[in-house]
Amino acid sequence: MFEVMVIGGGPAGLSAALTLGRQRRRALVVDSGKPRNAPADEMHMFLSRDGFPPAELRRLGRLEVAGYSTVEIRDALVTAVSGEIDDFTVEFADGRSERARRLVLATGQVDVLPEIDGLATLFGKGVYHCPFCHGFEAADRPLAVLGGDFSQSMLALYLADRFTKDLVLCANGGLEVGPELREALSRNNIPVREEPVVRIEGEDGALTIHFASGEPLERSALFHRPGQRQHTDLAASLGCELLPDGCVQVNAMQQTTIPGVYAAGDTARLAEPPGPTPFVITGVADGTKAAIWLEQDLFRASVEVPIPGTK
């Protein structure tokens, strides 16, 4: 039996594994090899690694974790999890299973894009979701935002405030906001095209947005804030409480509502903030926190002294 199983081999999972390895815990990291930021060539806001390739960060992270003899990394797909604290069973797609005393869920989320021809192909390479991650590189160029709801309209206002004065909101079938937000868009000189978007083609720096009617729109980059869903249903199957946006609810120690189950990265968040902060560097921090408090959990169980304020 492993002391800890970390499900997910991205920044959060590897960070948790690194911390556990340094405490000489017998841990298994299970990596499906499907990171959310796979389309991205660069990551940002990571001190000393600004502009670094995410895939290279994962490669180096795996090498560091592999340097600790008590930690094993396994490329596999988890299909089911069951059990309770001190005796969880994790099943794999190849028919094997392993047991662990504690779990860290770092399985991440999946972006859900509108079904528009060319959008998925260009996502991360001309079509971007985050102004913090990609706004600087797109500054002072003709930009567009895709979508007509509150979130996309606020994204358009933010980009116009921080990065460009040449921005078009492509509402993709209709602007679904109230008069105050419509007035804000007008006041900030953001034109709105409400025709449905049918196709996007080109490359980063030279996109063409085609509509169901009217002239195509030439832009340097397109921003869109997609919906998300959990990459797996493992947390739900264990009974972990989920927040309205689908994130796994955790406390300040990255504990879920199920004893012995921790969660880290963009799969989880505190209930109090209005939304997640799904950045690589915050995922690393979450993974470290989860491992530190999980370590304390195992230690206190060993010496039979509970952590104050925990179940």
Residue spans of the language-model regions?
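FAD-site-proximal beta/loop scaffold in flavoenzymes
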Residues: 121-137, 227-281, 293-296
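Short, hinge-like loop/turn segments at secondary-structure boundaries
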Residues: 45-48, 144-146, 185-188
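A conserved FAD-binding loop/helix module that cradles the flavin
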Residues: 17-18, 155, 264-311
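FAD-binding core/adjacent interface of flavoenzyme oxidoreductases
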Residues: 1-4, 72-141, 248-257
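Short, well-ordered coil/turn residues at beta-beta hairpins
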Residues: 8, 106-108, 113-115, 146, ...
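Active-site glycine-rich loop that binds ribose-phosphate moieties when present
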Residues: 125-132, 145-157
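Beta1-alpha1 glycine-rich phosphate/pyrophosphate-binding loop at the start
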Residues: 2-59, 142, 151-175
